[in-house]
Every structure is written in structure tokens, then in C-alpha cells.
């Protein structure tokens, strides 16, 4: 069965059905969006304390995709906030997973979009435009590859090829 046919299948069920073929992210994320279960085709951004490429990517049509941001696990500033959450929602993104921090949680939690992150930080990021888009990114003992499908819910994050 094609991964797209799973829709919002629970991550625990995907692990039971696919065993070792289901890649489980070992990073423990908090849920910050108004939706806690989401899935979609992976689009990636690799950046460090600089969210210019995150903004540029979310300004494109999302078509139900999920943006996976590898911020290097930095807890020193936010890579995503309420304005980017609204941009993602307006452009049809299903969700955003940030290996780093976000801010403006009081607003983001009211929006119907999935958002997972390591934590929160009130400081905004730099604006240098450094990083890479649509490259494999690795964290939490898993690699997220553009075009694969990611599933996220209260139990965690799972990738199916």
C-alpha cells in the first residue's frame, strides 16, 4: 500500500505494521500547533539560527506537505513564529517540524496547523540567508529525505520511504 493511503494513521500503528521499515525519530518534540496529528510529503531546510530559508520555503505552495527544519538543535533563538505559522497555513502546508525552537506559542496553538519543536525561545533568529533547501537532514537517529512521507502525532515522528 502507498504511504499516502495511510492519511493520519497513528505513528504507533505504522510502527506495528512496518516494523524496522518505519523510521522513528528519537528526538522528543513538544506539540505547539492547533493540530497534533499531521502527515505529508517531506520538504527540508537545513539552517542554524537563521530562518530566511524557512520563510522562503513556506511562502511557496505547500499542498499538504510538511516542512522539516534542521536547526542544529539550537536552543538560543526561534526559527519559527506566529507570522511564519500563518504563512504556512495560508499556503497549504500540513505542518512544520523544527529541530530547534519556536516562539509566539500563544498564537500558534490557536491555528489549525501541526507544529512540533524542541522548545520555545523569545529571541528571533538572524537573517543571513545561509543554509540549504531540499537536502537530506539527520537528527534523532533518522534521516529525513525530501519526497519521503512523514507522520507526526502525540506519540512521535515516523518516516516511511
Curated annotation (Swiss-Prot):
Its cofactor is a divalent metal cation. The keyword Ribosomal protein does not apply. A divalent metal cation binds at residue 104. Keywords: Lyase, Metal-binding. CDD domains: RraA_family. It catalyses: 4-hydroxy-4-methyl-2-oxoglutarate = 2 pyruvate; oxaloacetate + H(+) = pyruvate + CO2. Divalent metal cation. Substrate binds at residues 81-84, 103. One of its GO terms (biological process) is regulation of RNA metabolic process. Its EC number is 4.1.3.17, 4.1.1.112. It is an enzyme of class 4 (lyase). GO terms for molecular function: 4-hydroxy-4-methyl-2-oxoglutarate aldolase activity; metal ion binding; oxaloacetate decarboxylase activity; ribonuclease inhibitor activity. The keyword Zinc does not apply. Catalyzes the aldol cleavage of 4-hydroxy-4-methyl-2-oxoglutarate (HMG) into 2 molecules of pyruvate. Also contains a secondary oxaloacetate (OAA) decarboxylase activity due to the common pyruvate enolate transition state formed following C-C bond cleavage in the retro-aldol and decarboxylation reactions. Homotrimer. PANTHER family: 4-HYDROXY-4-METHYL-2-OXOGLUTARATE ALDOLASE 3-RELATED. Belongs to the class II aldolase/RraA-like family. This is Putative 4-hydroxy-4-methyl-2-oxoglutarate aldolase. It comes from Thioalkalivibrio sulfidiphilus (strain HL-EbGR7). The lineage of its organism: Bacteria, Pseudomonadati, Pseudomonadota, Gammaproteobacteria, Chromatiales.
Amino acid at each position: 500500500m502507498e504511504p499516502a493511503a495511510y492519511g493520519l494513521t497513528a505513528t504507533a500503528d505504522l510502527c506495528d505494521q512496518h516494523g524496522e521499515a518505519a523510521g522513528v525519530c528519537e528526538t522528543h518534540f513538544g506539540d505547539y500547533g492547533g493540530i497534533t496529528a499531521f502527515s505529508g510529503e517531506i520538504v527540508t531546510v537545513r539552517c542554524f539560527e537563521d530562518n530566511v530559508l524557512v520563510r522562503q520555503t513556506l511562502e511557496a505552495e505547500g499542498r499538504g506537505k510538511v516542512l522539516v527544519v534542521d536547526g542544529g538543535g539550537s536552543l538560543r533563538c526561534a526559527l519559527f513564529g506566529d507570522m511564519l505559522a500563518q504563512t504556512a497555513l495560508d499556503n497549504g502546508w500540513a505542518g512544520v517540524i523544527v529541530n530547534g525552537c519556536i516562539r509566539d506559542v500563544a498564537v500558534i496553538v490557536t491555528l489549525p496547523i501541526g507544529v512540533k519543536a524542541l522548545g520555545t525561545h523569545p529571541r528571533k533568529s538572524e537573517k543571513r540567508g545561509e543554509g540549504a533547501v531540499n537536502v537530506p537532514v539527520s537528527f534523532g537517529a533518522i534521516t529525513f529525505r525530501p519526497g519521503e512521507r512523514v507522520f507526526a502525532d502525540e506519540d512521535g515522528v515516523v518516516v516511511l520511504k
